[in-house]
């Protein structure tokens, strides 16, 4: 799963299963802004601080993990410095249920490379 969390805006999630992008009915797959979450503050306020972004991203990824349990998350967000903080929050939730639970999370620093690669793949189809 690839999570794009821009500053001050709603996140989006792209999920690839068996080599195919999941679009869902009405192309709603990945519209994580509709996830019901218990948050410490309004999403609009959380979306403006590094701590708030970590809370939002962690809770989104916990929800996604409980639904489809992806092997890997890839995150793009200018406000996330250390993905290990998010990784630890997710692992804490599942550790009591799943022995040796471990999730891989990577941070993308430069989004342009992935945009170009995605466009090239679309053109090749």
Describe the function of each predicted region.
Residues 21, 39-125:
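ATP-binding/phosphotransfer module of carbohydrate and carboxylate kinases, centering on a glycine-rich
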